[in-house]
Amino acid sequence: GGRYLTKEIHPFSFEEYLEYRHVHLTKFWELSPIKNDVLRLFSDYFYYGGLSEVFNMQDKKSWLQSLYQKILYSDIVIRKGVRNERSLRLLIRKLADSVMQPTAIKRLQNILQGDGTKIARETIASYLDYLHESFLTFSISCFTDSITERETIKKHYFYDNGILNLFLFQPETKLLENIVAIQLYKKYGEDLYYYNKNMEVDFCVPKDGLLVQVSYRMTEDATRNREISALQKVGKFLNAKKCMIITYDQEETILSAELGMDIEVVPVYKFLLDEEKY
C-alpha cells in the first residue's frame, strides 16, 4: 500500500491515451476519419481522466471512487495522522466545488465552520499541503505584487479529471478549466498564474506573455465579448505576445486591432495534442 498517487497520478496525456487506444495521429489527422476516433475518445478522457488502470474498467466511476478512498485514507489520514477526517473530506468537496474560483483560506475556514466544524486556518493550510504532496490537487497563485494575496488566495485544481468528476454535478465547465490547468501546470509549473485585477483572466504566464481564457461555448454574444474584452485589457497591460480562448469544440481566429494580433479560439482536444504550437 501507500503512495498510490506517486505511482498512479501521473496520468496519461491525451496523446498517450490515443496511442494506448491505437489511434496514431498523422500530419493531417483532422481531415481524415481519425478525427471521429479522436473526438469519441476525448469524451472518455475528459470525464474519466488519464489514469491507465481506469481505461479498461467497466465501472470507471466506482474504480476511481475506491482509488480516491485509498489515497485519502492511506496516503493522508494514516500517513499524516489526520485527526479530523470529516473536515478533510469536506475540504476536498469544497475545493472541487470552487475549481474555477480564487479561494482564500479564510473563506474555506468559514465554509467548514458553517458546517459545524471548528478548524484553524493553519490546519487547513496543512491539509492543502497534504493534498498537494499526495498528488490529488495543485494550486496556482494570483499574479500580483501583494505577497499576502499570492500566498492566501489561490485557485485549486485536481491532478486528474476522473477524480474531480467524482464530486461534480453538471461538471462540464469545471472539467474543461481543470484539464486546461493540468496541461498548463505540467508545462509551466510555478510560472503559471491567474489574473484578477479589475478583469479576470483564467491563466497567465507573464514571463512568456501568454494569456489563456477558458470558455465551454462562445455562442452567446455576452460570453464572447466578456472573454475578448478581458484578454484585450489585460493583454495590453501585461504586454501579451499570445492570447488564446480554449473551448470544448469551437475554433476560429479573432482579429484584435486593439492588441495588434489574433486571438486564437482553440478546441480543447487540439490544445492538448499540440504542445509545441500552444
Name these PLM-found stretches:
Residues 17, 46-49, 131, 160, ...:
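Conserved RecA-like P-loop NTPase ATPase core
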Residues 4-8, 243-245, 265:
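Conserved beta-strand scaffold positions in the cores of enzyme catalytic domains, especially
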Residues 205-224, 269-277:
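Mobile, glycine- and charge-enriched loop segments
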Residues 218-260:
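Catalytic cores of nucleic-acid endonucleases
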Residues 11-16, 163, 250-251:
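Conserved nucleotide-binding/hydrolysis micro-motifs of P-loop NTPases
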Residues 250-278:
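Domain-level recognition of nuclease-like catalytic cores that cleave nucleotide substrates
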Residues 55-211, 216:
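Accessory nucleic acid-recognition modules appended to NTPase machines
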Residues 1-102:
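Interdomain motor-coupling "hinge/lid" segment immediately C-terminal to the ATP-binding subdomain
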